[in-house]
């Protein structure tokens, strides 16, 4: 059930550029395209979803790299009909908290306060990069799990905790947490609810959505002629009926009538981007006979 236990860093604070990407892929080519895209070290999440745009993934590139040029590398793959870049325009919430105890279910209402983070410009030094490389590793379950990192970095364990606390205060580290495999933990209905929100209401609706404990992620993203939905929210439920009811409960409270739920039908990749680590990347254009 446990996927990883490590520091979770903020992509943008580290100078990385990232975007959600939606693709329409010919169904018989979908698996091949997904597996080729998975080879890119900047791809952390990659899902098949039940929609005309049937492949959704996140792509992050390090400082100095061009995200659009990096995305262009995938265009040589056979079977891609459309590609839509959907970068974050406003972030309202990020951070999955799965309720593992049924009898402690939260009422579906906007009851959470937004976490306040000091907005400090952060330019990572080589020392910072070395620290991040070490602390993004999956933690070993031992008596003193930070001892090895401290030795590798020439620090004490207390100094590690102080630096992590500082990173959290300035928003460089979002949290130090365990990441669960949603499906194995019983959360089989993972829905991306996309909302068509009037422009003047985007911030209000986004903040309200972010206050629902059931919503793990919430963003404003750009629209296209064939994609009118500008606010994205994620929910994680144990059944499709529960997800449908939860969506209706949320919808009544935010008063947005035009929306869709896109469920993930297949997970092709879910991992953490390894920051400040060099990787080679090559793709095979077509399916080999």
Segments from the language model and where they lie:
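A compositional/biophysical signature of low hydrophobicity enriched in polar/charged and small residues
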Residues: 1-289
């Amino acid at each position: 059930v446990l996927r990883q236990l490590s520091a979770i860093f903020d992509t943008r604070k580290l100078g990385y550029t990232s975007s959600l990407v939606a693709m329409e892929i010919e169904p018989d080519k979908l698996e091949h395209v997904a597996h080729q895209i998975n080879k890119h070290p900047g791809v952390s999440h990659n899902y098949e979803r039940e929609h005309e745009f049937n492949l959704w993934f996140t792509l992050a590139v390090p400082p100095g790299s061009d995200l659009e040029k990096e995305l262009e590398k995938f265009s040589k793959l056979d079977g891609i009909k459309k590609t839509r870049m959907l970068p974050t325009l406003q972030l309202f919430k990020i951070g999955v908290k799965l309720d593992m105890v049924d009898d402690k279910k939260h009422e579906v209402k906007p009851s959470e306060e937004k976490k306040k983070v000091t907005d400090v410009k952060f330019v990572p030094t080589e020392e910072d990069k070395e620290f991040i490389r070490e602390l993004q590793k999956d933690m070993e379950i031992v008596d003193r799990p930070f001892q090895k990192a401290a030795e590798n970095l020439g620090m004490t364990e207390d100094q590690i905790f102080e630096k992590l606390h500082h990173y959290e205060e300035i928003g460089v580290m979002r949290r130090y947490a365990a990441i669960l495999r949603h499906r194995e933990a019983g959360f089989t209905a993972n829905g991306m609810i996309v909302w068509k929100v009037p422009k003047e209401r985007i911030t209000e609706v986004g903040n309200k959505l972010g206050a629902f404990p059931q919503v793990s992620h919430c963003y404003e993203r750009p629209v296209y002629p064939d994609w009118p939905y500008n606010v994205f929210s994620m929910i994680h439920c144990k059944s499709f009926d529960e997800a449908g009811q939860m969506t209706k409960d949320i919808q009544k409270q935010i008063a947005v009538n035009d929306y869709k739920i896109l469920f993930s039908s297949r997970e092709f990749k879910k991992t953490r981007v390894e920051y400040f680590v060099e990787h080679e990347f090559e793709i095979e254009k077509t399916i080999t006979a």
